Amino acid sequence: MRKLPRPFYERDTVLVAKELLGKYLVHHDGLEEKIGRIVEVEAYLGQHDLACHSSKGLTKRTKVMFGPAGYAYVYLIYGMYYCMNVVTEKEGVGSAVLIRALEPIKNIQDRTQGPGLLSKAMRIDSKLNHRDLLSNDFYIAEPYGPTDFTIIEKPRIGVHYAKEWADALLRFYIKDNPYISKT
């Protein structure tokens, strides 16, 4: 499989989000290689986006979001679930794409419909925060075969607090894919 190159991630966050659909997320945790096809994502557009973690500025937690593109931003929610994001755009912007759901491709038996579930199924945790997605054991790759599908655009999930950003159409998923997260 061909890893996505750094310039792929250095582009506009919405474009990167849409183009991540259909790509393979690969994690080799030392025991086995797990592969999932990305079927749902959400774009977070930096400091002006009130739903984005970086909207509160540069902190220890958000530092990775302001760094170079093509790194993983992994954080814990509700004290029990990890969420995996891909840092996008140029350094200093603070943008990322949340991976919301995967279609199991290889060595995944658990549910993957939601960011916490997919992280558990793929064995993604805080040790992978700030990991370069060009590494040999954790990366995103071009899929095998054709990638024809229709992209659906909807508001992001769980960001009602984000004022005018709450209804922004920044959630993207593959139409009719059975692995998208439940709302």
Curated annotation (Swiss-Prot):
One Pfam entry name: Pur_DNA_glyco
Keyword Disulfide bond in record: no
E.C. designation(s): 3.2.2.-
Keywords of this entry: DNA damage, DNA repair, Hydrolase
Entry annotated with the keyword Hydrolase: yes
UniProt GO molecular function: alkylbase DNA N-glycosylase activity; DNA binding
Annotated GO biological process: base-excision repair
Assigned protein family: Belongs to the DNA glycosylase MPG family.
Name under which the protein is recorded: Putative 3-methyladenine DNA glycosylase
Species of provenance: Legionella pneumophila (strain Lens)
